[in-house]
Amino acid sequence: MISIDFEYCSEPKDWGLDAPYKDKPYAVKLFCVSICNEIGTRSWWLQDADQRADFIKWFDMNETYLAHAYEIAEAKCLAQLGIDPGLVNFYDTWTISMLLNDTREEASLVNMCKKFLGVNIDADIKELMRDHCIKDETQGHEEEIMRYCESDTVYLKPLLEKLAAVYNYRLSLSNCIALGTSLDYTFTDFIESTSNDIRASMIISKQGIPVNAEYMKRLQSAMTQFKMDYIQEMNSRFNCFKLKKDGTYSEDQAVIQELLKKEVPSNWVKTASGKLSTASETLKELFDCHRPDKRFGEWLFYWKEKVQPASKGIADGSWLTSLRGDRMYVSTLQPLKSKTHRWQGRSKEGYVPLWTGWTRAAIDPPEGWYAIECDYHSEETAIYGVIFNDPKYLEQYRSGDAYCYNAINMGLLPKECVSKKKCVTLEQQNMRSTIKTFTLAWQYGCGVKKLSVMSKLDMDKTKDYKKRLEDVYSESMKSKRIIGEQLGDNGTLVFPDGYPICYSNQYGHTTKLNAPIQGFGAYILRVVVQRALKAGFKIFATVHDALWILTQDINDGQRLKQLMEDTARELLHDDTLEVGEPFILAHGDHKCEDSEDTKIWKKYIGD
């Protein structure tokens, strides 16, 4: 439930919600403040009191306060649910209506739940509000709050949680709001990117462009493209949409009914009420894995075809895990190749008895066992240097601080600033921070416009920095351009073990600028897993460029490290790529209170 933190808003006069919200109902104000406090207590960029005040002040001046607050809160909710925060659900006509405070019958969240879940949540809404009406600050406003709650304006998180399981319209966040196209999102990255987008919106606002209109225009455009892609995909399979005279499409119910009479396709799902979903709800199979993981598609294909049979009895054959947000993902997937060259499948949030933190798995293995992680150190940088034969990337790999190295070679920092500690002035520290953001966005294929937004630089300076960075890594840029010319905007690269990586600039997954690197990293990890399983290691998680094993021998960490280094050396024909020291957790190092722990661990070690 979205909590209301009254510490910062004990009196209405302190809320800072003057025009245009001074005449708005109490419940709307309450919702705005609760959202602001919620994200304020969780987001690093709002920890500072002055930043917090500026944030509230800016939103007070814009009609889009509710929409933006909702957008951020929703993404947080999705992350907490284990749903990729790089996707934004529910951006369909109903949700747009809700964002605009529309309480028409068809816009009702209650009716949506009845339609898609087969459940009545009226009582849930009322119970939610009763919990909060006990607060002194809400006394005298109970009826008003109840009325607004029932019209879907406040406390949406528990309802979104219920809806998220079956209502799967998903849009790439990079298509909805101007973020980087294929950053390797963790939840922290998402919060940082979202804050940059808000700052960009502030700039738009100052230039006199209505933020709300601009936002809705981009959103509507992305929605239209998304739905057309979906209709084309479904028609290629089932021919279940028909073109109407006005140029729009509608479901062909006759075709759908015929399909339902036959054996139900395995990719069709049942709703909570037990009814079979129709074509418009099979997005679970089509778009559930539409997320910018560094090398998700080609790896899960390998997992399904090769690792699953080999690891039977070790990892239950379906436990592909990757860090995303504040928990681990567990995916069971049926990969397919669509017309847009995207690898996709079906994923679901599953229980893994190891996650409690933000950026690292916190595991409490059974007594007498160790959970050990080994990962490659700066894998992408090393692969850039070796595969593209770029001496600058190899120098960067050994420099100890990639961002200082880049800034020095770009002529933006003096040669003595070889590390963060050596950047002694505020100006030097700020420059390193800027180049860090700039380098990451550039390396993942962002264009000039996105680079400008991400690094908060004007266009002229952005173009200058981009040119300087490309000059530093001129050798790898040549190779990138050759690949781009040969394969165009969408294509497939096949690696030595026969598995492909597919990329699409249209959707901003793995782009042609980084596909060779991500794909080769996946290739290395595939071979490592194959050899580790053959050597008897019990692998229970893979996280991008890392493995987690469960063992009773603490020395297995060093053995796994050696196996990973030997494999990289053999496949790259180079000894550059290193493996960090094993991260070891014993029983009791982290407390895991979930009662399912013992049951789940048996999947890995037996009775």
Indicate residue ranges for each PLM-predicted region.
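Catalytic phosphate/metal-binding cores of nucleic-acid and nucleotide-processing enzymes, i.e., regions
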Residues: 4, 9, 27, 163-169, ...
